[in-house]
Amino acid sequence: MALVEAVEPIIYGNTKTGISFDSITGAIIAGVVVGLAKTAFLGKFPDYVEVLIGVGLLFMYGQYDLLRGIGFVLTADGIYGLIKNYISTSS
């Protein structure tokens, strides 16, 4: 949540710093949607594509709560996957 509060004013160019109920609900719904989508596609998308899609959603459609949630979930999950792959390949 701290990441959202830190990034939100930069992306939207305002002084709003706070997590609204809609953002939390959007993130929960987005987590379920992304989880189901990843299960259906069985991880066929590379992690960097997931990060690019997530960042694109944040920049283009960040004013909509559900799409913002999906963008954050995709970005966070993609970054986690990149870090996990880097650690497992370098060990």
Curated annotation (Swiss-Prot):
Keyword check for Transferase: no
Keyword annotations from UniProtKB, A to Z: Host membrane, Membrane, Transmembrane, Transmembrane helix
Membrane-topology annotation of the record: Multi-pass membrane protein
Subcellular location: Host membrane
TM annotation in the entry: 17-37, 40-60, 69-89
Gene Ontology cellular component annotations, sorted alphabetically: host cell membrane; membrane
Protein name: Putative transmembrane protein ORF91a
Organism of provenance: Acidianus bottle-shaped virus (isolate Italy/Pozzuoli)
